[in-house]
């Protein structure tokens, strides 16, 4: 697109961050709650930057802004009922202030941002493992525009057969096809708004057959060891 040009910036400086965090954990037989208060400030923060010339051509690159501060609260809670049910909920809300006065007097943002997520893992009759998870990004303001947020849910089931030698799994990402967001971008002499939507709903099916015997001395060799993959985990990890 000749009217939207992207280029690099070889003069970027590294970011330097100073942070402070206070954490607390409450643990009972079935429930664990972790809370964290945090504050951090970053100098020479790296951000995308857009300029539009008199001919209407947009130039997109990365720049250093003077400073950015983030302060807020993060909470993670996990509840278990034996080995059959696990619920994990997390969320964070924080205030962000960005100072870009090194580039323009009024460049920057000052507002709240937040996100949340959940994950439910369950063992049901017949040896089936079920997992449902979701995530939410709250609307927020950025240096040169706004982001309107989104929500998304995924689900998966799996089952072992023949004494664990065969495992079948089925996963659906973005079940309700909701992963899209609206945005605005504005600066000196330009304003743009739009909606971004990508193909996000997919169905994944897999069958794994394990055979042979893994010798003790071979465990952990190769790419991170046997079973080091992260996809489709039902042990509390993300898909």
Model-derived regions, located:
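Outer-membrane beta-barrel translocator domains and adjoining extracellular loop/strand segments
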Residues: 1, 5, 37, 45-54, ...
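Transmembrane beta-barrel strands of outer-membrane/channel proteins
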Residues: 18, 24, 35-39, 89-95, ...
